Amino acid sequence: MAKITPIEFKVFTKYIFDICGITLKEGKEYLVETRLSPLLEKHGCVSFSEIYYKAKRDKDLEKEIIDAISTNETFFFRDVTPFEVLQHKILPDLIDRRSAARRPSARIPIRILSLGCSTGQEVYSIAFILRTLGLGTDVYDIRVLGVDISNAAIAKASYGVYSDFELSRGLTPAQINQYFLKLDEGRWKIKDEYRWLATFETYNIFDPSRQLGRFDIIFCRNVGIYFSPIDRIKMYEKIAAMLEPDGYLLIGATESLTYDTDRFIPKKYLRAVFYQPNPAKTG
């Protein structure tokens, strides 16, 4: 495996920050080496300097670098608690309010966003819950949007095919048979009734030209940890602008908004913490 020099690492950290906003601090040299070494071999580069200069002239290679660096570990129903609060607190409360406010014969709109959705496991976990609650009927107008900066991750999420190993992380055998169809040895495809609830798009939250609309619920778990404090503030400002006034924000179990923004108020439900817009900071 190729080794990155201190000068190359400094150049690459700025380059990666410029193209996707991810901050790589000193000590993350191993991450760059392990994730980009296969690209060096693929593109016939002998050093990180060589692949850097090649990527500056090749947008496709740049996308491959983004895919490699931004790939995160993910699995179905990761951390469990956010999905419990979604099923037992957030969705029931939201549906009650939307039902009371809807016009006769109008469908009840529910908009959910998964930021940094990676290969789709979080989005499909949400879809499983929606179906469990009986929300896939014509009474509801549901949109679950998963976005990620990685083209490769979005392609896999859209395809909805996972390995035995990927399904075993978070799902029981009964759930696997309920949610998936077996394609062949070791591969499963998500059933259409869940797949149809989800849409996936490539998206960079720091791109000012892209507007996704408004959402009732936003999942942004373990995304801010990759950004600088200044960029985290920018990210949460954008999330605040996308969230409905009575909406919900769910972040990672080890994350906190305390030092990044006062645009949200923490709420507790059993073991879970979720956030809602701060009325004093709206407008």
Where does each model-flagged region fall?
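Conserved AdoMet
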Residues: 1-113
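Residue-level signal for inorganic ion chemistry
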Residues: 86, 218, 243
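Conserved class I S-adenosyl-L-methionine
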Residues: 109-120, 145
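Extended basic-aromatic, gly/pro-enriched interface segments that bind polyanionic ligands
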Residues: 115, 135-219, 223-227, 231, ...
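Conserved SAM-binding loop of SAM-dependent methyltransferases across substrates and taxa
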Residues: 119-137
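A short glycine-rich, Lys/Arg-flanked "PGG" loop and its adjoining helix->strand segment in the class I
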Residues: 233-245
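Conserved beta-strand signature within the Rossmann-like core of class I S-adenosyl-L-methionine
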Residues: 246-253
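Core SAM-dependent methyltransferase catalytic element
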Residues: 258-283
